[in-house]
C-alpha cells in the first residue's frame, strides 16, 4: 500500500551547509525508535526514522560522523551538520546500503506516516509510544525485514 506522497523531498540544514533529496516512493520502513542509544543521541524520548536505500539518496555537503555501538551491538555511524549540529542520518556498518534518515531533518515532514514503535521496553512514562501503531519491545528483526522488502522490490 502506498501511503506516502509522490514528490521528492529536499532538506536543508539550518545554515544551508548540507542538503539532500530522495524519492519518498521508495521508503522501506518508518518507525519511532525508543532505544536508549537513540534517546541519548537525540536528547529526546525517541528518534523518528525513515529507512531508505543509499542509492535513493542524493547528498550535497559534507556531514560529520561519529560512531558508536547501538543498543543491539551494531556499529552505528551518525551523520550530522558540523555547523549547527543537526542530526541527518545514520547507517549501520552491518547494513552499508541503507540509511536511517532522521524525520526531523526534513524541510517538510507533514507527509510522513510512521508505521511502528521499536524498543518500547525502553520507553519512559513521559514519552509513551503511540498505541495506534504496531509496537515491538525490541528490534523486530530489522535486517530480515529489509531483506524481504528488497526481494519484493526486484
Residue ranges, per PLM feature:
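A short Gly-Trp-Pro
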Residues: 8, 18-154
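Single conserved hydrophobic/aromatic residue that forms the stacking wall/gate
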Residues: 1-14
Amino acid at each position: 500500500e502506498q501511503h506516502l506522497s509522490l514528490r521528492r523531498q529536499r532538506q536543508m540544514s539550518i545554515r544551508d551547509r548540507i542538503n539532500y533529496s530522495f524519492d519518498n516512493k521508495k521508503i522501506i520502513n518508518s518507525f519511532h525508535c525508543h532505544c536508549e542509544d537513540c534517546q541519548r543521541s537525540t536528547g529526546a524520548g525517541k528518534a523518528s526514522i525513515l529507512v531508505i536505500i543509499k542509492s535513493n539518496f542524493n547528498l550535497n555537503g559534507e556531514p560529520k560522523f561519529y560512531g558508536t555501538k547501538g543498543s543491539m551491538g551494531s556499529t552505528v555511524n551518525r551523520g550530522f551538520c558540523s555547523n549547527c549540529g543537526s542530526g541527518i542520518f545514520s547507517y549501520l556498518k552491518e547494513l552499508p546500503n541503507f540509511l536511517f534518515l532522521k524525520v526531523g531533518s526534513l524541510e517538510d515532514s507533514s507527509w510522513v506516516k510512521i508505521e511502528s514503535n521499536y524498543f518500547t521496553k525502553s520507553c519512559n512514562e513521559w514519552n509513551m509510544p503511540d498505541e495506534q501503531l504496531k509496537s515491538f519491545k525490541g528490534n523486530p528483526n530489522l535486517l530480515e525485514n529489509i531483506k524481504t522488502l528488497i526481494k519484493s522490490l526486484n
